[in-house]
Amino acid sequence: ALQKAQKKKLRREARHFESLRNETVEKFARGHQPSEISTPSFVNDFRISNVICAGDNITGNVMLRFDITPLYGGFRLYMGGERNGTAAYAKGAAYPSSDHYGRVYTMRGGQPEHVVVMFYNIAPGIDTLDRVDISMGLALNTLNIITMRNVPIFWTYTDKAIRNFVREKSAKGNANQNQN
C-alpha cells in the first residue's frame, strides 16, 4: 500500500511538472513568434496564429504546433508530409517532417484547427529554425507552402526525464529521512 501511495505521489508530481512546463512553453511562445509567416495566394482566406515550437533536448525531437483558422467556409485540408515538401531548415541542414504524406484536417469556417508537425533529430545548440516549410492543399496534388522564418524553439525535457528527475529527488529525500 505504501508503494502504491508513493507511485501515486510520483505520478502527481510528474503531472505537476508537466503542467508547469506546458505553461512555460506557452508563455515563451506568446513572446517569441516567428519573425515572418508567408502564405501562398489562396491562403489569404486563413489566419495562422499561436505558433508554438517546443523541442525535447534529450532526443532532439521538435514539435511545431499552430492554429489555422479559415475565415470563410469549411473544407478539408491536406497538411504536412515529408514527400510533399514539409521540412525545417537550420544552420544549413534540412530536417524533413516525420509524416510521409501528412494529415487531413477538417476545417470549419471561423474555428481554429490545431495543426501539429514533428521534426526529428534536430542538432543540439540550435535555438531557432531558420525556415520551416509546411505544405498544405485542398488535394494531395495541389500543394502550396506556408513558410515561417526564424521560428524560436523552446527546449524542454521529456515527461520521462521529468519523471526520472522527480524519482531521483524523492529517493534523495528518503535517504535524508533515514539518517535522522
Each language-model region and where it sits:
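Alpha-helical, heptad-rich or low-complexity scaffold/stalk segments
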Residues: 1-11
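Surface-exposed edge beta-strand/loop patches
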Residues: 12, 17-18, 22-39, 76-89, ...
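Low-complexity, acidic Ser/Thr/Pro/Gly-rich terminal tails and inter-domain linkers that flank the onset
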Residues: 26-58
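Structural motif
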Residues: 43, 90-91
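N-terminal post-signal-peptidase region of extra-cytosolic proteins
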Residues: 48-51, 69, 99-102
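Short, well-ordered beta-strand segments enriched in hydrophobic/aromatic residues
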Residues: 62-70
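An anionic, turn-rich surface loop/hairpin at beta-sheet edges
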Residues: 93-113
